[in-house]
Amino acid sequence: MKRIPVFTVLLALCILTLSAQDNASKKSYTFLLTGASFASPNNGWFEIGCELSDANPLNRAIGGETIADAANRIIDGTLYTIEELEHIDALVIMQVHDRDVFDESQLKPNYTEYPVPFDRSNYAAAFDYVIKRYLADCYNLKFDRKSKYFNSRSGKPAVVVLCTDWHDGRVTYNTSVRKLAEKWGFPVVEFDKFIGFSRNALHPVTGEQISRLFTGDKQEIDGEIFGWHPENGKEQYIQQRMGAVFADTMRKIFPVKP
């Protein structure tokens, strides 16, 4: 068997790396995603949606995390760095645990007033921190001499995009995230509205929630059984549909450049 010289292998790897970097640099936008198991890279919808939107996907979602973890990762600099922030066009949040993320009863006027690190006791407070901190970080680039936004009036324009759960079973979260979006004037990726089925109608053959058709596991919400985690992979129908819904929302904010 003929051996391939090590130099040839290294050269090929170098060319592939440079090609990937070049393709990323040619994208019109960069979108940063934070989330948990519904958003992690093994799903595929975010990457599909970014491709349709001519955007570079920066997927920092990790299964098992919550919005509290996202807040803590901003604090320790692992969700994004200041250098990355310079190039991020939108922060997309898909932390969709079925909690009230709008409750204003314990919110602080200033994000610096929250005790850190965050625990998982108050989802609304963690959302409030992430939003205010991201907006502040974008604004403060106006004081960074290395930033292209240095000495500008507004700093870096901050775009935050919220997401519903992938179907309409999680009423508490879906309702409250829309209230949160309305409060801030943020766009919402309405997966639950455009996924193609509703909790209000059962499947005519199975007699179950239609979401059960697309998952290998299940969850109980208010005594009713729904599908839980949609099947992973870009080839899966739900991932493709979610990618299309996401791209449709993002194109309304960021038009595809010629």
Q: What are these language model-derived features?
A:
Residues V101-D103, R133-F143, F194-P204:
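Short regulatory "switch" loops immediately downstream of catalytic or recognition motifs
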Residues M1-N43, E51-A55, L79-D89, L141-K156, ...:
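N-terminal secretory targeting modules
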Residues K27-L33, F38-A125:
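Conserved SGNH/GDSL esterase-like catalytic core that processes O-acyl groups on lipids
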Residues D98, I131-K179, K183-W184:
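Active-site segments of SGNH/GDSL-like serine hydrolases
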Residues A61, M94, C163-T164, D192:
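A cross-family glycoside hydrolase active-site/sugar-binding cleft signature
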